[in-house]
From Swiss-Prot:
<dbReference type="GO" id="GO:0030036">
    <property type="term" value="P:actin cytoskeleton organization"/>
</dbReference>
<keyword id="KW-0770">Synapse</keyword>
<feature type="domain" description="WH2">
    <location>
        <begin position="497"/>
        <end position="514"/>
    </location>
</feature>
<dbReference type="GO" id="GO:0045120">
    <property type="term" value="C:pronucleus"/>
</dbReference>
<keyword id="KW-0009">Actin-binding</keyword>
<keyword id="KW-0963">Cytoplasm</keyword>
<dbReference type="GO" id="GO:0005938">
    <property type="term" value="C:cell cortex"/>
</dbReference>
<dbReference type="GO" id="GO:0005925">
    <property type="term" value="C:focal adhesion"/>
</dbReference>
<feature type="compositionally biased region" description="Pro residues">
    <location>
        <begin position="423"/>
        <end position="437"/>
    </location>
</feature>
<dbReference type="InterPro" id="IPR028288">
    <property type="entry name" value="SCAR/WAVE_fam"/>
</dbReference>
<dbReference type="GO" id="GO:0030027">
    <property type="term" value="C:lamellipodium"/>
</dbReference>
<dbReference type="GO" id="GO:0032154">
    <property type="term" value="C:cleavage furrow"/>
</dbReference>
<comment type="function">
    <text>Downstream effector molecule involved in the transmission of signals from tyrosine kinase receptors and small GTPases to the actin cytoskeleton. Promotes formation of actin filaments. Part of the WAVE complex that regulates lamellipodia formation. The WAVE complex regulates actin filament reorganization via its interaction with the Arp2/3 complex. As component of the WAVE1 complex, required for BDNF-NTRK2 endocytic trafficking and signaling from early endosomes. Also involved in the regulation of mitochondrial dynamics.</text>
</comment>
<feature type="compositionally biased region" description="Low complexity">
    <location>
        <begin position="333"/>
        <end position="346"/>
    </location>
</feature>
<feature type="compositionally biased region" description="Basic and acidic residues">
    <location>
        <begin position="182"/>
        <end position="202"/>
    </location>
</feature>
<keyword id="KW-0965">Cell junction</keyword>
<dbReference type="GO" id="GO:0003779">
    <property type="term" value="F:actin binding"/>
</dbReference>
Length: 559
């Protein structure tokens, strides 16, 4: 259906009804025809004015664009011809901070809008009948839609096209996302190396050189493998930390504990002996083989293991680990080096217990108190320890660089009474903190009031001289389990704090999701009825490699 933009009136010049009572009809028809011609000429002049007015507006806008382009060309010509690169250096900041040129030309779209309606069409539209007043029912609708749009909606077809374009764009984006996820889930296939063509030139050259000069095929292949992948002995020549020449007077068993500890501390490789591997069975020796077999020391467990080595080799490698073992306990004066050497070479010695933990100070309160390790003294000398002291409240202390290790209970081996007297005295007890300080970690006072029954014997089973391990504390500092707390805790309840924190985290996540949703909605609302933006978004999604690149030109179109 053609749309008539301009209509010239009257269409018919002579098709008119003559009034009655006219005597000269020919003269009347001539006058009516001339009057209609004049009216048509006036319509033509009016429409000519509209046409030339539109042409004038187009020419004016074109001249404005040409003038702006000429000004830009003049500025560029001046800067290009007069700029001397030897004298004036263009700073990098001017290049990076300068914005790219952006055209201010409005794209031709929405040609058939109410704002772009020409004057002749507006006059024709005004002549038409008015639609029924359905907008009166709009305030009574619950969906918020205009009532007149159910009767007539000029933007219906454009909205339908816009919805389809946006849906296609979203479908393409989802398809790309699924394809990307499928590519990530698919295992990486190794690149197939094409088979090299078979060439017998090398074989003929070998035959021409003779068997004396020709190299062996295996050696040549080995050289090619070494060139491609490195020497074959790369995995066999790793530097291993071991100690050789450990037989005779230079054996490990003949060294004192200080040199042994220093030797084990130098290790820089990982341990080559599994800590939980059972010892191999001792090899069978002949009657004339009386050479003692030194033991292999594994520092992974910090104990001496009875690991016989093979007597076939002249050297006894001792593999050590990079972690230095704990220093052995000080030897009493009654023990000599010869007795130690004899005890290490003859029979497997008992495992050496780990050293006791260092005494904790007032500012170092471990979260879990380690169980006390019994000393290696005679069974009749062990003195019952006093009841544990309830740790008073201390303030939070700065983090300690290294926590005290928790020692495990080891069997106590009895020693002679002479060796017990040569032992050094136990370390003094740690000083008690002032009563107004809180501990760095919460410790239950009632749990500490009951010591383990297996660690402290009764006083009746410990006769002889007493070796006090810790001075008895005054009874005022010992808090029994049945006594309630005197000072109520002012700290907030942990469950409430955690619940508040979790609630805040949930609210933060919810707010973030709502903000992202609003941003997406605002982004879609900014599109409005911009055909160029909708098409550019679809083209960007179709031709972009990644999902993020689909929004790169949206801001340029909207600004």
């Amino acid at each position: 259906m053609p749309l008539v933009k301009r209509n010239i009136d009257p269409r018919h010049l002579c098709h008119t009804a003559l009034p009655r009572g006219i005597k000269n009809e020919l003269e009347c028809v001539t006058n009516i025809s001339l009057a209609n011609i004049i009216r048509q000429l006036s319509s033509l002049s009016k429409y000519a004015e509209d046409i030339f007015g539109e042409l004038f507006n187009e020419a004016h806008s074109f001249s404005f664009r040409v003038n702006s382009l000429q000004e830009r060309v003049d500025r560029l010509s001046v800067s290009v011809t007069q700029l001397d690169p030897k004298e004036e250096e263009l700073s990098l900041q001017d290049i990076t901070m300068r914005k790219a040129f952006r055209s201010s030309t409005i794209q031709d779209q929405q040609l058939f809008d109410r704002k772009t309606l020409p004057i002749p069409l507006q006059e024709t539209y005004d002549v038409c009948e008015q639609p029924p007043p359905l907008n009166i029912l709009t305030p009574y609708r619950d969906d918020g839609k205009e009532g007149l749009k159910f009767y007539t909606n000029p933007s219906y077809f454009f909205d339908l096209w816009k919805e389809k374009m946006l849906q296609d764009t979203e479908d393409k984006r989802k398809e790309k996302r699924k394809q990307k996820q499928k590519n990530l889930d698919r295992p990486h296939e190794p690149e197939k190396v094409p088979r090299a063509p078979h060439d017998r030139r090398r074989e003929w050259q070998k035959l021409a050189q003779g068997p004396e000069l020709a190299e062996d095929d295996a050696n040549l292949l080995h050289k090619h493998i070494e060139v491609a992948n490195g020497p074959a002995s790369h995995f066999e020549t790793r530097p291993q930390t071991y100690v050789d020449h450990m037989d005779g007077s230079y054996s490990l068993s003949a060294l004192p504990f200080s040199q042994m500890s220093e030797l084990l501390t130098r290790a820089e490789e990982r341990v080559l002996v599994r800590p939980h591997e059972p010892p191999p069975p001792p090899p069978m020796h002949g009657a004339g083989d009386a050479k003692p077999i030194p033991t292999c020391i594994s520092s992974a467990t910090g104990l001496i293991e009875n690991r016989p080595q093979s007597p076939a080799t002249g050297r006894t490698p001792v593999f050590v680990s990079p972690t230095p073992p704990p220093p052995p306990p000080p030897l009493p004066s009654a023990l000599s080096t010869s007795s130690l050497r004899a005890s290490m070479t003859s029979t497997p010695p008992p495992p050496v217990p780990p050293p006791p933990p260092p005494p904790t100070t007032a500012l170092q309160a471990p979260a879990v108190p380690p169980p006390p390790a019994p000393l290696q003294i005679a069974p009749g000398v062990l003195h019952p320890a006093p009841p544990p002291i309830a740790p008073p409240l201390v303030q939070p202390s700065p983090p300690v660089a290294r926590a005290a290790p928790v020692c495990e209970t080891v069997p106590v081996h009895p020693l002679p009474q002479g060796e017990v007297q040569g032992l050094p005295p136990p370390p003094p007890p740690p000083p008690l903190p002032p009563p107004g300080i809180r501990p760095s970690s919460p410790v239950t006072v009632a749990a500490l009031a009951h010591p383990p029954s297996g660690l402290h014997p009764t006083p009746s089973t410990a006769p002889g001289p007493h070796v006090p391990l810790m001075p008895p504390s005054p009874p005022s500092q010992v808090t029994p389990a049945s006594e309630p707390k005197r000072h109520p805790s002012t700290l907030p309840v942990i469950s409430d704090a955690r619940s508040v924190l979790l609630e805040a985290i949930r609210k933060g996540i919810q707010l973030r999701k709502v903000e992202e949703q609003r941003e997406q909605e605002a982004k879609h609302e900014r599109i409005e009825n911009d055909v160029a933006t909708i098409l550019s978004r679809r083209i960007a999604v179709e031709y972009s490699d990644s999902e993020d690149d689909s929004e790169f030109d949206e801001v340029d179109w909207l600004e």
